Design a protein with these regions (language model features):
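Short, glycine-/aromatic-enriched active-site segment of Class I SAM-dependent methyltransferases
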Residues: 207-242
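A SAM-dependent methyltransferase catalytic signature shared across enzymes that methylate proteins
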Residues: 15-22, 234-251
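Alpha-helical linker/edge segments of TPR/alpha-solenoid repeat scaffolds
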Residues: 379-391
Length: 391
């Protein structure tokens, strides 16, 4: 039976540059839902269009969203996902909040008395964990009434509602943190402008989002989701923050994408948002073709790993893998995936296939360090000099 999805949609411009053309990098999302992701031809932002309207998405969150995503759960100590109702779920949830608190404490400097606001604070547990280290003044914004009340019971001054409706009067915050919310927001630039207005001039903003340069699981069947309206990269999220009047001080490209920023002092007569220009991109060479090519390779490698796990090795699979390695890839994922294939092939005594894989990486359009790493690996496996010397 088809899953219920938001039924009212709209064509969306690129949230960073306002463009409307690009390369399609996905046609579906998790649970088989129709989700069309476009990589913008101008700035390489990956975003959904057409997308659900804000009203339709709001109704979806209030109705069937939890039916679809409520069972996703959190990682246990063994790295396996524990869903709601399973043994160990509460411990996994605590571990998740602890990780968020650790990230905040590691990436920003907090002091006793600091006014800290978390947007999408849920039950307030991350803020409470931070309070165990520093005597912060904890504030939250949470649209869910039940979770907002839990946050208040935990001692967090929590506003029930959306960011755009939050009005703190004259109060300004020393730190604002936003964990895995921005990707859900219809108008991210407006939201960041709002957050800038809530910060002290010396305040910090910490944003965490899924990282499109480091996806997880199958690309269309898992990473892309109907509720993730934008898939940010280390190139595009900092540029969006710069448009909103922030100076980006740290970018952590490690699994999730973390960005730390502070309000930028504006020149006389300057207004926000700043106009888009390619100078906002720290890596302008990472254009739509660059991103789309690597997402294609990522998707292929993930599907081949799944086939290998379910059906085992075959000449056809090795041939498909070697062909895929002739295209650009995200280096970390490429190294991890190929290490898996080589290890599994060697365990089955399939030395020739393992050599094909190592040499394909060594001879492919990949970073020099990675190519040399696999060239050395091929040498240890006994590749003939003429094959190694082709690198």
């Amino acid at each position: 039976m088809a899953l219920e999805v938001p039924d009212a949609t709209e064509n969306a411009p690129c949230p960073l540059c306002g463009g409307s053309t690009g390369l399609v990098v996905g046609e579906k999302g998790r649970f088989g839902m129709p989700v069309r992701n476009l990589c913008c031809a101008t700035c390489a932002t990956v975003y959904i269009t057409p997308r659900p309207t804000a009203a339709a998405m709001g109704e979806y969150y209030r109705s069937t969203y939890r039916k679809h995503y409520g069972g996703v759960g959190y990682l246990g100590a063994d790295g396996k996902t524990i869903a709601v109702g399973q043994d160990g779920y509460e411990q996994a949830l605590v571990r998740w909040h602890q990780q968020q608190a650790n990230n905040a404490l590691t990436l920003v400097t907090l002091t006793d008395g600091a006014k800290v606001l978390e947007v999408g604070c849920r039950s307030g547990q991350t803020l409470k964990l931070i309070q165990e280290r520093y005597a912060i003044q904890a504030f939250g914004i949470e649209p869910g009434e039940d979770e907002a009340e839990q946050a208040r019971q935990a001692g967090v001054a929590c506003f029930t509602g959306a960011l755009e409706d939050f009005e703190p009067g004259e109060r300004r915050f020393d730190h604002v943190q936003w964990f895995h919310v921005l990707e859900h927001v219809h108008e991210p630039l407006a939201a960041l402008l709002k957050l800038r207005s809530l910060l002290e001039p010396s305040g910090t903003l910490l944003v965490e989002v899924p990282n499109v340069y480091q996806p997880y699981g199958l690309l269309e069947e898992n990473f892309f989701q109907n509720v993730h309206l934008v898939s940010y990269s280390p190139n595009t999220l900092p540029a969006l923050l710069r448009r909103a009047g922030f100076d980006v001080t740290r970018v952590i490209d490690d699994g999730s994408l973390f960005v730390v920023a502070t309000p930028r002092a504006l020149a006389a007569g300057a207004s926000l948002p700043a106009p888009y220009g390619r100078e906002l991109l720290s890596m302008p060479e990472q254009d739509a073709d660059w991103v789309a090519a690597r997402l294609r390779t990522y998707a292929t490698l993930e599907k081949l790993q799944l086939l290998f796990k379910h059906r085992g090795p075959s000449p056809e699979l090795t041939s498909a893998l070697v062909s895929a390695l002739d295209f650009p890839a995200f280096p970390g994922h490429l190294a991890e995936a190929c290490a898996f294939f080589v290890e599994q092939l060697l365990a089955r005594g399939m030395l020739d296939d393992a050599l094909q894989v190592t040499l394909a990486v060594a001879q492919g359009p990949h970073p020099l360090e990675l190519r040399h790493q696999f060239r050395n690996f091929a040498e240890r496996l006994g590749a003939p000099p003429e094959a190694r010397d082709a690198v």
